[in-house]
From Swiss-Prot:
Subunit structure: Interacts with major capsid protein L1. Interacts with E2; this interaction inhibits E2 transcriptional activity but not the DNA replication function E2. Interacts with host GADD45GIP1. Interacts with host HSPA8; this interaction is required for L2 nuclear translocation. Interacts with host importins KPNB2 and KPNB3. Forms a complex with importin alpha2-beta1 heterodimers via interaction with the importin alpha2 adapter. Interacts with host DYNLT1; this interaction is essential for virus intracellular transport during entry.
Modification comment: Highly phosphorylated.
This protein's encoding gene: L2
Record motif Nuclear localization signal, residues: 2-10, 533-540
Job description of the protein: Minor protein of the capsid that localizes along the inner surface of the virion, within the central cavities beneath the L1 pentamers. Plays a role in capsid stabilization through interaction with the major capsid protein L1. Once the virion enters the host cell, L2 escorts the genomic DNA into the nucleus by promoting escape from the endosomal compartments and traffic through the host Golgi network.
Protein name: Minor capsid protein L2
rRNA processing keyword on record: no
Protein keywords: Capsid protein, Cytoplasmic inwards viral transport, Disulfide bond, DNA-binding, Host endosome, Host Golgi apparatus, Host nucleus, Host-virus interaction, Late protein, Microtubular inwards viral transport, Phosphoprotein, Viral penetration into host nucleus, Virion, Virus entry into host cell
Amino acid sequence: MLARQRVKRANPEQLYKTCKATGGDCPPDVIKRYEQTTPADSILKYGSVGVFFGGLGIGTGRGGGGTVLGAGAVGGRPSISSGAIGPRDILPIESGGPSLAEEIPLLPMAPRVPRPTDPFRPSVLEEPFIIRPPERPNILHEQRFPTDAAPFDNGNTEITTIPSQYDVSGGGVDIQIIELPSVNDPGPSVVTRTQYNNPTFEVEVSTDISGETSSTDNIIVGAESGGTSVGDNAELIPLLDISRGDTIDTTILAPGEEETAFVTSTPERVPIQERLPIRPYGRQYQQVRVTDPEFLDSAAVLVSLENPVFDADITLTFEDDLQQALRSDTDLRDVRRLSRPYYQRRTTGLRVSRLGQRRGTISTRSGVQVGSAAHFFQDISPIGQAIEPIDAIELDVLGEQSGEGTIVRGDPTPSIEQDIGLTALGDNIENELQEIDLLTADGEEDQEGRDLQLVFSTGNDEVVDIMTIPIRAGGDDRPSVFIFSDDGTHIVYPTSTTATTPLVPAQPSDVPYIVVDLYSGSMDYDIHPSLLRRKRKKRKRVYFSDGRVASRPK
């Protein structure tokens, strides 16, 4: 069920008009408000009979504060213009003002006693009183009495005005005439200046300090006056003679600086901006390489053709001139315009470039020919490229020398030395060491051939490695592989020179730590694969609810 929508009450003014028009019932507050029968209206209606508030505007909301009488304030007097000279006019009292006017007596003022002036202070100058025009226009009243008479009399002061037609020059009466300044004339201006001298900060005129000039109040510098030395120990500096019209160069250069040709610090004219570098490697330019050396200085010879018809001797020089014309570069023959040379620094060297415009292959009706743009260049300084083949010279390696291989016997017996290189160690063992005879002349085995040692050196008197090689006598049966393990050093002898001997021994129990191969030309070693730790795969097992293993994946 939907809630009833609340209907807003109509405006009281609309309710009152509807009720009066239709004759229906209206709310009592609406009727009292528009018929002014509220208690407040009744109080104002009956209270205004006995009390009169005038035009104060109580209850109107204006707040004007009363009614203005006339053009000015209540009881006010219009201002009198200062232009007319004579007695003041008697103004009538306005009828709208208050009926009772209270007269306030004025007390006479004593004459002003001048204050004593301080001799140490400047005297005060009083400016003359100047009557200036009013800021606002005043109301001018007509004079009701003639200026010749003085009707105004307050009983205390007598003012007598003598008409202008009477002559008072010889009556023995002194009349003082006061001249009033004109309204437009502001009068003379007075400027005062006061100076105080403090004797505490006075500087003596005579001083012994060289170059002191602040001691005197006035300094006069003249071209014809002689110089005066201030102080005893003064350094004399030669000065130039100054004359009118001469220009003195006051340029001061620091030590080590040189004078330049510039006269002013600011340039007198705007410098010309340098042109932007050309970009001749765009798609709109055809790249043409020119090999003729005349392209560098006299490129016009490669473009223009000489006409042999105008020569004097045609029969003798026609063929030669024609050959000379045909000698022109074919790439520059149809060029219509050629720019100035540009020098560029490339990775291959110094390059001279010129931008050219070929003759138009397409012409319009107006005579305009459209041609292609080309970039002509020539490399004059190839860098990194040999002009002529140079024979290669074999150079010795600096700071490197071959190693020394020494065969040292175990017991104190004479040793056998053989100089070999470290890089060709395997080849030396096969080719040179096998030629050593280890048997005596009687055919018996020599004891000196056993327990030999190989000592390898880098050439800097530093022993790299020493290993003992037990060599068997007879033929090519010599050790090939050394296997070091916990049980000692195992030597594997090859049974055949053709078959390949495995590096790993046949017994799986003998697992070597390091395998050394003397015939590979290197002394590096590798860890046996059996010693490397293998990565185990994590097995996933499936369990039942009772905890038993269901199966093991392979």
